[in-house]
UniProtKB/Swiss-Prot annotation:
Transmembrane segments annotated in the record for this chain: 22-40
Membrane topology, as annotated: Single-pass membrane protein
An annotated GO cellular component: membrane
Protein name: Uncharacterized membrane protein EP148R
Domain of life: Viruses
Biological classification of the source: Viruses, Varidnaviria, Bamfordvirae, Nucleocytoviricota, Pokkesviricetes
Keyword annotations from UniProtKB, A to Z: Host membrane, Membrane, Transmembrane, Transmembrane helix
Amino acid sequence: MKKIFLTMTPLPYMNHLPENHYFLSLTVVISIIHLFTTCVPQHNHSTHFPYLNHARHLNHVLHPSHARHPNHVLHLNRVLHPNRVVHLNHVLHLNHVLHLNHVLHLNHVLHPNHVLHLNPILHPNHYLVSRYYPISRHYLHKIFRLFM
């Protein structure tokens, strides 16, 4: 089996350049090659967005500014993907609309049939009236737009 050796001989047009300039050019070329071999996104969702998983068990704050792949749609102002079960243990941040005392904690599972299971069961046609979830009527249409 033949072995190929990479020689460090300068190219002919580089003979008149200083030695440090040649090694600087070589360093730039190696840096560019390293950049393309390590930073170019592969066709793998976890490489593009490491915080995305197929299992949508979220232990962090959801924020609408994060980029999300179309197959894992979870835009807070868009539609929840019907094939994903979303388990939210923390605060659902709706584009800074919910005031601090109007925070919606989802400790149960959002069912694919668009029924929001909380401590009291809430259908999108109903209003959530509870001292534990003090959400005003002004915010309800923004919340239910997620499930429609």
